[in-house]
Amino acid sequence: MAHENVWFSHPRNFGKGSRQCRHCSSHSGLIRKYGLDLCRQCFREKAADIGFNKYR
C-alpha cells in the first residue's frame, strides 16, 4: 500500500474528526447547536449575516 492509500483511510463516522466547519473545514471550536456546524471564528464573522444579535 502506498502512502496515498493509507492516509486518512480509517473511517471517521463519529467524534471530532467526523465533523468540520462548513466554511473553513476546521475541526476545532465547532458550534453544532441549531445545525450551524461553524467553527467559533467563522461564527463571529458570519453571525450578523445569519441573524444573531449581540445584546451586551
Curated annotation (Swiss-Prot):
Entry GO terms, CC: cytosolic small ribosomal subunit; yeast-form cell wall
**NCBIfam families xrefs:** PRK05766.1
Does the keyword Ribonucleoprotein belong to this entry?
yes
The alphabetical list of record keywords is: Cytoplasm, Ribonucleoprotein, Ribosomal protein, Zinc
Q: What quaternary arrangement does the UniProt entry report? A: Component of the small ribosomal subunit. Mature ribosomes consist of a small (40S) and a large (60S) subunit. The 40S subunit contains about 32 different proteins and 1 molecule of RNA (18S). The 60S subunit contains 45 different proteins and 3 molecules of RNA (25S, 5.8S and 5S).
Give the required cofactors. Zn(2+)
Tell me a Gene Ontology molecular-function term this record carries. structural constituent of ribosome
What is the name attached to this protein's record? Small ribosomal subunit protein uS14
Q: Which InterPro entries match?
A: Ribosomal_uS14, Ribosomal_uS14_CS, RIbosomal_uS14_euk_arc, Ribosomal_uS14_sf
Q: Which Pfam families match?
A: Ribosomal_S14
- Specify the taxonomic lineage: Eukaryota, Fungi, Dikarya, Ascomycota, Saccharomycotina
Query: What protein family is recorded?
Result: Belongs to the universal ribosomal protein uS14 family.
Q: Where does Zn(2+) bind?
A: C21, C24, C39, C42
* Stored Gene3D superfamilies: 30s Ribosomal Protein S14, Chain N
The free-text function statement in the UniProt record for this protein reads:
Component of the ribosome, a large ribonucleoprotein complex responsible for the synthesis of proteins in the cell. The small ribosomal subunit (SSU) binds messenger RNAs (mRNAs) and translates the encoded message by selecting cognate aminoacyl-transfer RNA (tRNA) molecules. The large subunit (LSU) contains the ribosomal catalytic site termed the peptidyl transferase center (PTC), which catalyzes the formation of peptide bonds, thereby polymerizing the amino acids delivered by tRNAs into a polypeptide chain.
Please list the GO biological process terms of this entry. Answer: cytoplasmic translation
As for subcellular location, the record says:
Cytoplasm
To which species is this protein native? Candida albicans (strain SC5314 / ATCC MYA-2876) (Yeast)
